[in-house]
Amino acid sequence: MLIVDNKMFAINVGDSRCVLGQRKGGDEKKGGEKICIEMSIDQKPMRDDEKKRIQEKGGEVSEKIPGAPRVFRKNDEVPGLAVARSIGDIVAHEVGVSCEPEVFEKELDSDDHFIVIGSDGIWDAMSSCEVVGFVFQKMEENKEICSRLLAEECRNRWEVLNLFKQKYIMEINSNKDGEMKDKNAQHNNFDIDDITCIIDFINIEKEDY
């Protein structure tokens, strides 16, 4: 993300996301309509345009590895990349994964209050609009710790989801007496995806426009 003379450029490769938080109407600190604007599009392999390019280059998109759709060489188990654009993945680039960024731009004004840049661990736990609402609420209390609070909220949501997954697996692996059919099922570990976020609070004065 780059801001030059109040013009914002969001430059993205991968599945991190950049979201702008706006408030229209109300005063500077509360009220008004809260709006989220996605300043990037997640570059997932299942996106129609990304999938088409990958297939034209001899790659395929499938779920050979359980979970998210990934990019593979045909009839192969590599590279198994869960994004359609990346930097430095040589094998993936041979089968249509691109290193070319997508660029979005916007002229900032006094309605624009903050920009959130986050890894997919944020957006898999909360929607863009949920994140914007959360930040607006927390920034009224303490801007300095907003990013930490957002990361903690997302981590908590991942942990709750993993508890439900564990409970479900134990239920389907239990016999009628409550004994585990698969002794290893109760020891399944569920990952929490990378949770990284940066919040940039914008200070554009009305008299600048």
Language-model segments: residues:
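PP2C/PPM-type serine/threonine phosphatase catalytic core
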Residues: 1-209
